[in-house]
């Protein structure tokens, strides 16, 4: 939502932005902000939709350590805007090579509008703001829908992409790492927080490989759902980790961030645990 106030000079658009207390994530506030004139090289996105999931919480929890708070800095100390995957349209441009009306997929804040200093790329735009310089290119990339080979039109398809696409890529890259290392000599992989989207992406890729047994570990509440997905050879609950045979080599990938559960895995398998990868923190309370 937005409001327009008229002055003698020009209209001032007030847009809503959502801010989180960086040290008390349950504390949030909505702020009305006026939009300044665009500087040369800048564009203004109107955010249309974004996905809010447990993974979004991870961005906030690890915001200081991994720099997620720096994606879209807040002017007021102690507050921040959480990034989320979604879709937005360019509604104003002060860049000679970027037209209004184009729609893009990428990282956006939980705000109605966001201004970026951009550079055109082969498939879209890249955020060139100095506060983003230290971030990996994948986090700064915005893909234009008419240049996106994976784009599917329609609200349902766009919702699914916002929910799943980014984390499937994370799972794919993690599985590719294990494959490049021949699964460290193991023929089994234990996937913690198996119902999470990154885990499902990983398991989908691992399940396609010959000779790799994929064991999902999840909560009792999520067991039936995780089993029904069909990409795990076996699904067990956290309390049943000790029932998995520990005599043969195994590797693990943890999306939960639960130190107590991961410690049980290391204790149970001992030297047979050939590699332990940690990604994310889905068990944050």
Where do the PLM segments sit?
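Glycine-rich beta-strand-centered segment in the early N-terminal region that forms part
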Residues: 36-50, 64-115
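Aromatic- and Gly/Pro-rich amphipathic surface segment
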Residues: 58-81, 127-142
């Amino acid at each position: 939502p937005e409001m327009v106030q008229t002055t003698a000079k020009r209209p001032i658009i007030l847009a809503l932005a959502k801010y989180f207390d960086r040290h008390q994530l349950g504390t949030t506030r909505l702020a009305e902000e006026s939009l300044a004139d665009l500087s040369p090289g800048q564009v203004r996105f109107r955010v249309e939709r974004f996905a809010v999931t447990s993974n979004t919480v991870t961005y906030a929890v690890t915001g200081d350590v991994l720099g997620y708070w720096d994606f879209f800095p807040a002017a007021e100390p102690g507050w921040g805007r959480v990034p989320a995957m979604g879709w937005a349209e360019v509604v104003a441009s002060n860049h000679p090579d970027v037209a209004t009306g184009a729609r893009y997929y990428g990282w956006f804040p939980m705000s109605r509008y966001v201004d970026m200093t951009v550079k055109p790329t082969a498939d879209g735009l890249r955020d060139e703001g100095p506060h983003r310089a230290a971030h990996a290119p994948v986090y700064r990339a915005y893909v234009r829908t008419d240049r996106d080979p994976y784009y599917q039109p329609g609200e349902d398809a766009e919702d699914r992409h916002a929910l799943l696409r980014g984390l499937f890529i994370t799972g794919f890259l993690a599985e590719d790492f294990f494959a490049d290392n021949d699964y460290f000599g193991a023929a089994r992989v234990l996937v913690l927080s198996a119902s999470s989207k990154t885990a499902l992406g990983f398991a989908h890729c691992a399940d396609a490989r010959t000779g790799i047994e994929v064991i999902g570990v999840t909560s009792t509440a999520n067991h039936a759902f995780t089993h029904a997905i069909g990409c795990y050879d076996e699904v067990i609950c956290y309390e049943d980790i000790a029932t998995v045979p520990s005599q043969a080599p195994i590797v693990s990938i943890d999306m939960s961030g639960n130190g107590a559960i991961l410690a049980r895995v290391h204790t149970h398998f001992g030297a047979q645990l050939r590699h332990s990868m940690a990604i994310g923190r889905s068990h944050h309370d």
